[in-house]
Amino acid sequence: MTVRDWANRGQTYVNARAPNLLGRFRSTDDEDENNPSTELATDTTSAYGSTAASVVTMANSKPDDVSLYATSSHHHEYFTGSAWIHPVYTKEQMDALEVNHRKTETFSDRVALRAILLMRIIFDLCTGYKHPKEGEAHLPKFRMTTRQWLDRFLFLESIAGVPGMVAGMIRHLHSLRALRRDRAWIESLVEEAYNERMHLLTFLKLQKPSVQMRTGLLIGQIIFYNLFFISYLISPATCHRFVGYLEEEAVITYTRCLEDIDAGRLPELASMEVPDIARTYWHMEDDCTMRDLIQYVRADEAKHCEVNHTFGNLHQTSDRNPFALVIDNGRPQPSKDLTTFRSVGWRRDEIAN
């Protein structure tokens, strides 16, 4: 059977399906005479006739929003749901959220905290941030513009999404080698990385990073990924403590931003429209504001703080993940939402087994 015969046999199916398929994938720009995909489709002549034209049009068409950094508010049929359903946070829970610094108790705790303090210095230099003392936030030298805040968020989230994926990957490979289950650690770690990436994708809808920023993110990710990978092989408990302290710093960042919004120092940021990706992921109300969005992100970071400080207290190979399954023993237990939130983490003897 020749190629032409195969094309003719499939032409009936393609003609019946193409209008529906093209309607889902074709952009409004495809109708423009200057659009390459339209020109390619109309100028193509071959033995395949309309079949070839249809396939070429589909292959070269593009959705409205082809860039991660686009600010278009268009809705798309091809938008996929979240791999993990985000827990619902109430406004009362987020308003009452307090994150306390966990004091160091062991040598590994001190190593983790000092590593974070060093990383914080580099992070502040890269984003032009200076942390004010009590009552000094209004001074000009501590002022942060909307662009500076969004740059800081982008930098933070691009780094914060690394530990969960690295830890999850290492534990996944260990589970394969050991031929046994991981007691549900992998799921929470990968979900954490996914959550941080959703933060990043949300802020990318609000601001496109500069070339310098993207270069810095690339270099930072390469260095941080490899250092964290090696460190997790050596001492996973120390790495979880490190992430716990990292999330404490993230909470401080978003808390400071909320204070600036409330004080009227960020009118441009406060007036921005919440991206659709955020509305869907966090189940936000129709009248939500940027302040609400920052509160949701802050609550996520606080939750990661609790999870990783708890993981740092547990036996790394034999203890179960207490956030994956809640066992009722008559005492408060860790949960996926904020109902039993404890920022400094849960001690091993507090968790039901």
Curated annotation (Swiss-Prot):
Keyword terms: Electron transport, Iron, Membrane, Metal-binding, Mitochondrion, Mitochondrion inner membrane, Oxidoreductase, Respiratory chain, Transit peptide, Transmembrane, Transmembrane helix, Transport
Main location as per UniProt: mitochondrion
Keyword presence, Cytoplasm: no
Name of the protein in its database record: Alternative oxidase, mitochondrial
Residues given in the record as Fe cation 2 binding sites: 196, 247, 301, 304
Residues binding Fe cation 1, per UniProt: 157, 196, 199, 301
GO cellular component terms attached to this protein's record: mitochondrial inner membrane; mitochondrion
Function (record text): Catalyzes cyanide-resistant oxygen consumption. May increase respiration when the cytochrome respiratory pathway is restricted, or in response to low temperatures.
Species annotation: Yarrowia lipolytica (strain CLIB 122 / E 150) (Yeast)
